[in-house]
Amino acid sequence: MADKKTVTPEEKKLVAEKHVDELVQKALVALEEMRKLNQEQVDYIVAKASVAALDAHGELALHAFEETGRGVFEDKATKNLFACEHVVNNMRHTKTVGVIEEDDVTGLTLIAEPVGVVCGITPTTNPTSTAIFKSLISLKTRNPIVFAFHPSAQESSAHAARIVRDAAIAAGAPENCVQWITQPSMEATSALMNHEGVATILATGGNAMVKAAYSCGKPALGVGAGNVPAYVEKSANIRQAAHDIVMSKSFDNGMVCASEQAVIIDKEIYDEFVAEFKSYHTYFVNKKEKALLEEFCFGVKANSKNCAGAKLNADIVGKPATWIAEQAGFTVPEGTNILAAECKEVGENEPLTREKLSPVIAVLKSESREDGITKARQMVEFNGLGHSAAIHTADEELTKEFGKAVKAIRVICNSPSTFGGIGDVYNAFLPSLTLGCGSYGRNSVGDNVSAINLLNIKKVGRRRNNMQWMKLPSKTYFERDSIQYLQKCRDVERVMIVTDHAMVELGFLDRIIEQLDLRRNKVVYQIFADVEPDPDITTVNRGTEIMRAFKPDTIIALGGGSPMDAAKVMWLFYEQPEVDFRDLVQKFMDIRKRAFKFPLLGKKTKFIAIPTTSGTGSEVTPFAVISDKANNRKYPIADYSLTPTVAIVDPALVLTVPGFVAADTGMDVLTHATEAYVSQMASDYTDGLALQAIKLVFENLESSVKNADFHSREKMHNASTIAGMAFANAFLGISHSMAHKIGAQFHTIHGRTNAILLPYVIRYNGTRPAKTATWPKYNYYRADEKYQDIARMLGLPASTPEEGVESYAKAVYELGERIGIQMNFRDQGIDEKEWKEHSRELAFLAYEDQCSPANPRLPMVDHMQEIIEDAYYGYKERPGRRK
């Protein structure tokens, strides 16, 4: 008779790979068929499959028990019931097909798709329940699954999978929706995990298997080992805690990975707890028996030289306590549920503090709460990172402290950890037989694995516009002599007036004090009149210190933009002293989503803004410009918390403003309105304000400068505030960005700087750009058309957008000339060489300015440098190229 042919390892590998490839190819066909199923069909299939498994839960438990020789039949039946009942009930209403969620407000639509062919790895500890669980969550998500069962539980696992598969096919699932390797081997399992047709690996098993799954170069839902401590703190319900731990540890002879591996007991209740523990047939081994138990379970004795390399004897997994004791060499009373061994510490020197997957538990005494938490933490970190930890206590705060201290994904409070860990019995954890350990356990999932983990959720995002706003002072008073409101304003007793020397010398401060003195109540006031043009942060800090000492209930900012800007930041520092100036000046894309959140103001004081120039609009805006003169920087600060409480726009306060000041501030108004009108953030609400302000400027500025008549001064004062209302909500653009930086470097007058730059900016923004802004409010580039609208309103030639742009730029330049402004920087006394040397730096700084993001087109540094260099000579001499 011929000798039987020996199969080489290579031949064995090829056979395994061929078998696996056939399974995966069938699964891929099934996947396409499963994609066609609707939600109703899927739910029907899952329901029928779960009922079939439920009907066979007892015979499957018996099969698993007989095949593996491990665990407890009744408990295996319970685990099968759990997989069929709790898991299915939890995902019963979960949508897993097609559109699963639509939100008309956010514009998001979520679409669920299967991940693809699933490789299912199952352990010997829970063979049938895990096969049922993974099959059902795969069917729920329309994923075909191919199993590699543990060799020692191949037949019972296949029995469970077959029942689910046959019921699913009968209910409408495609053939080969559930398959398995028929001849288990390491080669076959490896081939399955590494097959290119497998989309993901759902692995439950030992650390080596999970590590292998993660090394396959594809998404894996692998879960790690546990080493679960149960800390019984002195305030715990002792009888309940002992009952729960015995029930949990003895369940299926301790084979659930979430079962307790050590109980840590406060010294104050140690004896009482041990007595209660013993009443449930827990046997405490003596010193000699402990050594025998260690030797049998791990092949080492406590504190021996080779403790570090101790390995669990796989023979003990799921075996009864009586059998383990007998095999170890000692006897215990019949009916013993658990073997308990008192240990002195957690770690390598005490091998019984390792995971044991059997009815063997370590018992440790804790000297204090801190010691109890430390020992629990050490248990988790001793080859059980991320899995589970339990605490029994009546102290809610201690539970939180414990949860923070231990590196466990599941912290189970006052419950048996076996059932607490798998979820949905004693707590609201997701019901699962695959428990993720997060990054602590080097897992990709940090929760109980469920159907949702086997879905690709596609998001369809509809285009949306952010909710816009109009935020202004709660009250704005205007008309001549409207400062009389100060007589009637409520709750005014301690007033700090922030102003400058000019307001004192011109008598405006006295007029404000006069109104306060006419109140029925006595008003105490503090004056800070040291605000300089372009106020420095040091000035703001000095004013804030005075404010803190005085403790006002009302702040009055009197003057032009400088006193109002300085007063706003003093207000902020006074009410919120912990604020850092560097945080305030950071740039943002969306004022509502900025990295630094400004605190709300107004709890201590109200803020009343009274402008005495017609330019900044600061009385109604959330902006302030503060200088850092030591570093030649100007910082525009923006947040709606800086919006004044009340604005008083009294034209009687601007009648004596010199003509050259009226000219400069008037052109600032025009720049505000123009930039707000074409801003990315412009809206129907701001456009009307901006257009009216532009109209008022062109109709009244020249007369206001040359004649200083009441009518034109009043209209320009109104135009300033109206433009402020517009740009407070639409923001500004690069004319202001460049003006801020040029002013900081060369100390030019702000309004005049804007006047010189504005014609260039109009032509720049009026050209269709190659590079548009990111996420503007408009749906197509329309700045050129909006300039055309302005030109038409002013009666300028504007038959095309291009003509309107040129007409408006020219009109702005000519208006500046008519009111006496030298419309170039050369005539502002700036050296040409120095100007050119700084042009690049100024362009970079302007790009970083807070006004730049709202410019209608994305401002490029090179382009702004070119504008700055051309503006030295003026629009008439060098209008610049269309960019």
Swiss-Prot record:
Swiss-Prot/TrEMBL keywords: Iron, Metal-binding, Multifunctional enzyme, NAD, Oxidoreductase, Virulence
Span of the signal peptide: none
Catalysed conversion reaction: an aldehyde + NAD(+) + H2O = a carboxylate + NADH + 2 H(+); ethanol + NAD(+) = acetaldehyde + NADH + H(+)
Knockout consequences: Disruption mutant produces significantly less acetaldehyde and NADH after ethanol treatment. Significantly lower H(2)O(2) levels after ethanol treatment. Decreases intracellular pneumolysin Ply level, but no effect on choline binding protein CbpA, surface adhesin A PsaA, or pyruvate oxidase SpxB. Mutant releases 1.59-fold lower level of Ply into culture supernatant. Significantly lower hemolytic activity in vitro. Attenuates virulence in CD-1 / ICR strain mouse intranasal infection model. Significantly decreases cytokine levels, e.g.
GO biological process: alcohol metabolic process; carbon utilization
GO MF term set: acetaldehyde dehydrogenase (acetylating) activity; aldehyde dehydrogenase (NAD+) activity; ethanol dehydrogenase (NAD+) activity; metal ion binding
Coiled coil: none
Disulfide bond entries: none
Superkingdom as given in the UniProt entry: Bacteria
Cofactors: Fe(2+)
UniProt enzyme class: oxidoreductase
Induction: Up-regulated by ethanol at both the mRNA and protein levels.
Annotated residues for binding of Fe cation: D668, H672, H736, H750
Annotated PROSITE patterns: ADH_IRON_1 (PS00913), ADH_IRON_2 (PS00060)
This enzyme's EC code(s): 1.1.1.1, 1.2.1.3
One Pfam family cited in the UniProt record for this chain: Fe-ADH
Annotated domain remarks: Contains an N-terminal aldehyde dehydrogenase (ALDH) domain and a C-terminal iron-dependent alcohol dehydrogenase (ADH) domain, interconnected by a short linker.
Similarity comment: In the N-terminal section; belongs to the aldehyde dehydrogenase family. In the C-terminal section; belongs to the iron-containing alcohol dehydrogenase family.
Protein name: Aldehyde-alcohol dehydrogenase
Organism: Streptococcus pneumoniae serotype 2 (strain D39 / NCTC 7466)
